[in-house]
């Protein structure tokens, strides 16, 4: 669910992340559904919004003449029994010293606003229903039906309060008090704070790290353990452009990032569990895909909705064609994920090791082929350096696990292939004239994926060849305030895109490896300042306006915070320790 500062829930998919949106007015103000609560008189109104400390419970305060006149507290019930789904939204409305007229407006628009519901008044509220879906609103306020929505303008007395509850998948309603919303609120508060207390991190930028961890946690679909890259679809990478994608899937290359990040701050159980859940899905399908659905629905068909788009950005897409691409780096990602899981305390059993050996056999065959690589180019496949390096990194992880764990493996053969890949990249993927690695064989261009080379261990960060590469990336792809574009290459799509936030975190990791800690800290603080009022990030940012671009909130951006803050803390502590020796 996304709750805008004007009191509108303007995006929400129920009962699951990948279900057709019920609330989608962020993509089409006229057609899309919404659930709004706000002061009727919005003149001279200031709005503040924040999370209750160490929770994902959202508070929105409407302020006039310096005083809070109305507060809403929004949450979806959660508890330690996370596999039980609560497709409900509870909204607590309270006034303070003055009477306030409020507007409540409720319009679920099922199946991306393509199905017109039957609206029935029932005791305690209204129920909206189609052939397959039902959703109700329970409230003490007297709502009225008007065409495709129900609403009320209500005069609330000073220091009064009430609950308004939206429930998906129901056939009848109870009184609002019967839903025990206050008890659900306390349970949800306790759940989030208990989860947050399991973190072992207390270092630099602790509040941002924990907000990112909480944001990441809410992107998990508990019944299967899968995580969406973002809970939204078709929020544009450029206003008015066509780069509008559906991110409500699990990307296999994100797996290693998730495991490493969660384990870094103490969530080893979640890290190991995520890998096992991911492996369970892969084993059932007996193949590796670029992306996976969170509930095994396998609905990847990319299609366009008849929506106006966010700020006129069309087409509005759901589904994702990336599932059909060959992205060789994903094989390296899953092997590195298993290695990360092992370092986090997980067990590499015989089943997992058999899987690793199968992956190494595939990489041995595939690494020489062109692919679409990490940026999922929709143009002709090429020999991307990043995919070669990820193949090298897979062999590095497999060899290390075999040696450390005493596992049977053709280590000599693997080392020979690893060396072959390294020599191939150094011969065809490095340009002596510019003293830099290049995006793909035969190219003169750099791309930001090359920032990962030292992080993956392919080349030391202080090697002159990487320093030359980093200099070119700074000169050609850094745009403003430590923000980076992915590449300058024609990718077959019209229009421009914003700066990818994850790239800044890769850059910071490189600076840490170079022991340029002051520069790393400056870059991290710069990116922290770019978070929104809730401490959240999208995928990209418009470097000119500071506006967020792309889907939101974006897992990789928050994984970046979780990864680099502890690394920077550790590097500073090591420096202090050396000084004190």
Curated annotation (Swiss-Prot):
Monomer. Inhibited by validamycin A. Optimum pH is 3.7. Active within a narrow range of acidic pH values (pH 3.2 to 3.9). It holds the Pfam family TREH_N. GO terms for molecular function: alpha,alpha-trehalase activity. Keywords: Carbohydrate metabolism, Glycosidase, Hydrolase. This is Trehalase. The keyword Hydrolase applies. Pathway: Glycan degradation; trehalose degradation; D-glucose from alpha,alpha-trehalose: step 1/1. Catalyzes the hydrolysis of alpha,alpha-trehalose into two molecules of D-glucose. GO terms for biological process: trehalose catabolic process. It is an enzyme of class 3 (hydrolase). InterPro entries: 6-hairpin_glycosidase_sf (IPR008928), 6hp_glycosidase-like_sf (IPR012341), GH15-like (IPR011613), Trehalase-like_N (IPR045582). Its EC number is 3.2.1.28. Optimum temperature is 50 degrees Celsius. Gene3D superfamilies: 1.50.10.10. Coiled coil: none annotated. It catalyses: alpha,alpha-trehalose + H2O = alpha-D-glucose + beta-D-glucose.
